[in-house]
């Protein structure tokens, strides 16, 4: 009887280990924001919209931002890389464009997407948008 309990315990531990190992996703697989489909380390979920994404390998030190012509959003989940700014086509979505460097001395005006304080003319980047102090 005691031997049966030991075998059952070992089986239970091994089953839990394999269930955890299979519950995460690998490179190229679809992940989601609810973490019901999460990526296995070292992969991260690169979101294509607010709910879904694809497991990718990203340099942890690299900032994820968008370039000229790519679609950005007001939630700052898709930000433009400097020197590009998000030109909004509606209240939520826009396209990364290059601002005229003659306007504002090359800095970003209020309500434009930013990554750092120094990107903004006001020197204040708050929650991904420039704001006046």
From Swiss-Prot:
Where is the signal peptide, in residue numbers? Answer: 1-21
Q: Where in the cell is it found?
A: Secreted
Q: Which organism is it from?
A: Schistosoma japonicum
Can you say what this protein is called? Egg protein CP422
Annotated disulfide bonds? 107-121, 114-125, 120-130
The domain comment in this protein's record states: The presence of a 'disulfide through disulfide knot' structurally defines this protein as a knottin.
Instruction: Supply the alphabetized keyword list.
Output: Disulfide bond, Knottin, Secreted, Signal
A single Gene Ontology CC term: extracellular region
Q: Which domain of life is it from?
A: Eukaryota
